[in-house]
Every structure is written in C-alpha cells, then in structure tokens.
Amino acid sequence: MPLYETVFIARNDVSQQQVEAVADGIAALLETDGGAVKKREYWGLRSLAYRIKKNRKGHYMLLGLDAKPETIKEIERQLGLNEDVMRVLTLRVDEIDEAPSVILSRKGDERERGFRGPKPAGRFESGRGGAGGARRGYDDREEFRARNEREDGRDTDGEAE
C-alpha cells in the first residue's frame, strides 16, 4: 500500500486530548480498512501564519499512514466534516522517516523563542571606527558633566537657574 503523511490543524480552544481523540478516530478508521498509522507526532499549539476561522493558533498533528487511496479520501472527508479541524494536508511519500521531524527537533532549540543569535559586529565594534569604538571628536566626560549639571539645577554654562 502507498504511504502518506497527513498534517491537520485543530482549533486552539480544543484540548490536546481532543486532538489525540481525532487522531485515534483516524487510526480506528485505518485499521478497519487494513491500513496502519506508522508515525504519530503532536507538534503542539503553534501560531498560524494567518487567521483561519478567527483563530490565530492551532494544534498541529502529523500522521504517517500506510493505507489505500480510497481510505485516504475517506479520512480527508471525515477530517473536513469535523468542526474542530481547520486545515488538512495529505501528501504521498516514498518512505516515512522514523526519526522525529524537523519541527520537533527545533522545538527545544533556543532559536524557537525569539533568540536571533549574537549581534553582528557593527562599525564601532569592529575597530574600523576609531580608538576603542568611540565616536570621533566626542568626549564621554563632557556629556557626563552636562548631565550632572542639569540634574543639579545649574545651566550648562555653570550658572544656577
């Protein structure tokens, strides 16, 4: 039998157990027709690229299936009728990887939560901008003195206001 990968996105207001129940229903349907679920991954609640049916997030589930084409059509029909499922994508594949998918392998990576890596060296940090990264013709002490004088209530000329 041909191999397929199906990814479906469930609404964000359903629980993970309900998403697992939808996947269990698919597995039961497959087993009655002689197919099998070879791989099953819950990717979690993730942000959507755009709003779908007024939802900004969704529960993602990947299923690796070994089934007849008629059974796959029935699975897609059942998922389309389910109100909790927003989107379904089924692809025919040559083989199903037993290793965790790229989505799961990146999940614990620090880049997942907004970490963009170390800041690249700018003009001043690279040593091309002058002595020690300071601006040309600029003295830190002058700014410090001017700031202190303003806080003391004195004008920058040294006179009291």
From Swiss-Prot:
Q: Which GO terms describe its cellular component?
A: cytosolic small ribosomal subunit
Composition skew (Basic and acidic residues), residue ranges: 136-161
One molecular function GO term is:
small ribosomal subunit rRNA binding
Q: Which HAMAP family match?
A: Ribosomal_bS6
Q: Give GO BP annotations, semicolon-separated.
A: translation
Give the protein family: Belongs to the bacterial ribosomal protein bS6 family.
Question: Which Cys residues form disulphide pairs?
Answer: none
Name the gene.
rpsF
Purpose of the protein: Binds together with bS18 to 16S ribosomal RNA.
Region of interest called Disordered, as start-end residue ranges on this chain: 107-161
Give UniProt keywords alphabetically. Ribonucleoprotein, Ribosomal protein, RNA-binding, rRNA-binding
Cite the SUPFAM superfamilies for this sequence.
Answer: Ribosomal protein S6 (SSF54995)
Organism in which the protein naturally occurs? Gluconacetobacter diazotrophicus (strain ATCC 49037 / DSM 5601 / CCUG 37298 / CIP 103539 / LMG 7603 / PAl5)
Name of the molecule in the record:
Small ribosomal subunit protein bS6
